[in-house]
Amino acid sequence: MLLCRRARARRPERSLSEGLDDLVARIRACRICRDEPEGAPLPHEPRPVVVPSQRARILIAGQAPGLRVHETGLPFNDRSGDRLREWLDVTRDEFYDPALFAIVPMGFCFPGYDARGSDLPPRRECAPAWRGQLMAAMPQVSLMLTIGQYAQAWHLGDWREASLTATVANWRAIFESGEHPRQLPLPHPSWRNTGWLKRNPWFEAELLPVLRAEIRMRMAAEE
């Protein structure tokens, strides 16, 4: 143990960035959901899709990759991503710039489909194994977008309401709570939620303008 402490003392130049790179390499090699699963193992080869960043001030905390993201290795590379970028009012190039956005879903691998053909929930093994380490490695993040019930359950704590609608409707109190990083809860941008958006017009009328202003403010700080 003493030897380890001395080794660290001789390497003060080791940066948080190097530590994050090591962490990402271990995540890319992770097979816990296949080899040590909680319940049924992942039915296909794991392919973790996660884009942490040592510079980005905005963290997108989503659910888990869909099939197309699993195939391409690019997060939100689907219709849900198109809608999310529309909400944020950013281009694809801006969205995929790691100096601007970190993208860290609750589950890093495509979880597969249920009997109805819908995506399964994020794997239960993933967040306990990796999320705390990733968050600690990104202290510069000042705005977190918690997308969907799984990210909100993990990150919002007592601020999470009984339903996603109630949680998102309470966005202003959550945003102004003084927590760090500041959080804005969002529904999943899936096109299956088009009906939800129509039933809740306040989301586009009230929340999105604040979201876009906060995004632009942080992006401008990187210019």
Question: Where are the regions a protein language model picked out?
Answer:
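A polyanion-binding, active-site-adjacent surface
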Residues: R5-R6, S15-M219
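Short intrinsically disordered terminal tails
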Residues: A221-E223
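Short stretches within intrinsically disordered, low-complexity N-terminal or propeptide regions
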Residues: A9-R11
